[in-house]
């Protein structure tokens, strides 16, 4: 449930133009983004300068909002900026800085691969499970059950496959194992 009574940031990542295929899961169109801004009430959205001023001076009010864009993705500029401009809104634009330390975030590549080569996330997940040889009993343990309850509470739009995938990626496989499975799937596509 969306809470109207606390100050917070609305964080966004991926966007695509309406009428085009999303390049990754969770991507929004300009129409959906516009609807979200209207739903939360555009008049409640503060500029980054005003947000920082209120934080520094302990003047942030119940219900104040700011908009943030993470990872410096091109779709944010191409799609979301036109909606911000329409309402003369400003946002925090956070760059993806880990490239300065370790290179490309492969998850961005994997996201594009999944949405480009599979008709659904469930079909991808089935192939992922087969390729990774993860036993289905993994999802019967208490660690997974706790993870599932947390994820479904925080992200009620996630499917069972989404949650299972994230558990495997984050906890069941080492990074090198996860990347190996993804690379194998990409090479066999």
Label each PLM-derived region with a short phrase.
Residues 1-65, 85, 95-127:
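N-terminal pre-catalytic segment of deacetylase/amide-hydrolase enzymes
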Residues 70-71:
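Noncatalytic alpha-helical scaffolds and linker/capping helices
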Residues 76-80:
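Membrane-embedded segments
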Residues 90:
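Residue-level detector of anion-binding/catalytic polar loops
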Residues 103-189:
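Extended, charge-rich helix/loop segments that form flexible
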